[in-house]
Regions:
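N-terminal post-signal-peptidase region of extra-cytosolic proteins
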Residues: 37-45
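Sequence context surrounding c-type heme c attachment/ligation sites in exported
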Residues: 67-171
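N-terminal pre-domain segments of enzymes
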Residues: 1-35
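Short, well-ordered loop/turn sites that connect or cap secondary structure elements
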Residues: 51-54
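Short, conserved secondary-structure segments in the cores of folded domains
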Residues: 45-47, 137
């Protein structure tokens, strides 16, 4: 990000969406991929994707804490999945309450969130996953990425006013 407090993505962050997003307590999500300069993701004969070393998958989570106030939109966390030489690394950054900065979590954490939706107020524990928890879902069996896959990307996305099939746009 060029400005953490403003949530301004850097120019090399390519946004993408998924066809079947996972539910995370009503959190809004923004997804990005960063590829090393001159590198591409390739499709293998079995339909899976091969990511070059240095690829970074980014997912940011935010939540509207009070549906009466747009100003209550709060960034909660950003997760990074980084392609290394032999495997993937997982990193969760938890934003401070004001969203101006984020801290790398060494372990998982929980935070009680108070959310008002449709005149109903509820408090629930929001969970920030540890590296081990990330690796549980993002295993070799799931190709490490649950979202950046052919079946999830084969749909349209709005690229700053240009609506295009993601597989075409990302090619």
């Amino acid at each position: 990000f060029t400005d953490v407090a403003a949530g301004a993505p850097a120019a090399d962050l390519i946004p993408f969406g998924v066809n079947s997003p996972l539910w995370t307590d009503g959190a809004a999500k923004a997804r990005y991929v960063v590829l090393p300069p001159g590198e591409v993701v390739t499709r293998l004969p079995d339909g899976t994707l091969a990511f070059p070393v240095g690829t970074v998958l980014v997912k940011e989570f935010a939540m509207l804490l009070d549906d009466r106030r747009a100003s209550s939109f709060r960034r909660l966390e950003t997760r990074f999945v980084v392609r290394g030489q032999t495997d993937w690394g997982f990193f969760t950054y938890r934003y401070d309450e004001d969203g101006a900065d984020a801290q790398l979590l060494a372990t998982g954490a929980d935070e009680e969130l108070r959310v008002r939706r449709d005149a109903v107020v509820e408090t629930f524990p929001y969970h920030f996953p540890s590296r081990a928890e990330c690796a549980t879902c993002h295993s070799a069996a799931t190709e490490r990425s649950l979202g950046f896959r052919i079946d999830q990307l084969n749909g349209v996305f709005n690229y700053a006013g240009v609506i295009e099939n993601q597989l075409v746009a990302l090619n």
